[in-house]
Amino acid sequence: MTLSADKKQPIIDKFKLHENDTGSPEVQVAILTERINLLTEHLKTHRKDFHSRRGLLKMVGQRRALLNYLRDRAPDRYRKLIQELGLRK
């Protein structure tokens, strides 16, 4: 499940750090979160789609690694990001 450009651009605009930013950890985590949410909805109706489930697990692992990187390098940006995305309680 991929995001179309028109859905991806508002996410990039919201989380970018500077004008041409598309690859900062914040942007990557936000895009992965949206993809994870879409795939989770897909898997609720297609329970036996194990290939997509594997892709979901890979995306969750990738997001976890990016969040760990951000937590170690910039804890204040990490806390702000998880609050905006609602990833923690």
UniProtKB/Swiss-Prot annotation:
One of its GO terms (biological process) is translation. Keywords: Ribonucleoprotein, Ribosomal protein, RNA-binding, rRNA-binding. GO terms for molecular function: rRNA binding; structural constituent of ribosome. Pfam families: Ribosomal_S15. One of its GO terms (cellular component) is cytosolic small ribosomal subunit. It comes from the Bacteria. Signal peptide: none annotated. The keyword RNA-binding applies. The keyword tRNA-binding does not apply. One of the primary rRNA binding proteins, it binds directly to 16S rRNA where it helps nucleate assembly of the platform of the 30S subunit by binding and bridging several RNA helices of the 16S rRNA. NCBIfam families: S15_bact. Belongs to the universal ribosomal protein uS15 family. Part of the 30S ribosomal subunit. Forms a bridge to the 50S subunit in the 70S ribosome, contacting the 23S rRNA. This is Small ribosomal subunit protein uS15. It comes from Desulforudis audaxviator (strain MP104C). The lineage of its organism: Bacteria, Bacillati, Bacillota, Clostridia, Thermoanaerobacterales. The gene is rpsO.
